[in-house]
């Protein structure tokens, strides 16, 4: 089975998880759950890649700063 979306989670530049998702709604639900810096010491970065290769990024810093690209 082929996956259309990929959600990667990094804590302080270390890859800690990769999810492969089949459809938009599944990817959207997983992306919506990325809401804080988790177990990272400095920051957590979440990358969602769609079927066209476009990447969306959320970065949550321990100091409360949030950057979404």
Where would I find each of the regions flagged by the language model?
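Surface-exposed loop/edge segments in extracytoplasmic proteins
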Residues: 13-19, 55-57
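Intrinsically disordered, low-complexity regulatory regions of eukaryotic regulatory proteins
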Residues: 10-12, 21, 63
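A short, charged, amphipathic alpha-helix used as a generic interaction element across diverse proteins
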Residues: 17, 21-43
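Short, mixed-charge low-complexity intrinsically disordered segments
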Residues: 36-69
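Short aromatic-glycine-(Arg/Gly/Cys) micro-motifs in beta-strand/loop hairpins
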Residues: 1-15
């Amino acid at each position: 089975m082929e996956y259309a979306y990929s959600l990667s989670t990094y804590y302080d530049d270390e890859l800690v998880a990769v999810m492969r998702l089949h459809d938009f709604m599944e990817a959207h639900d997983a992306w919506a759950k990325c809401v804080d810096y988790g177990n990272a010491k400095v920051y957590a970065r979440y990358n969602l890649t769609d079927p066209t290769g476009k990447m969306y990024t959320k970065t949550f810093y321990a100091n409360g700063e949030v950057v979404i690209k």
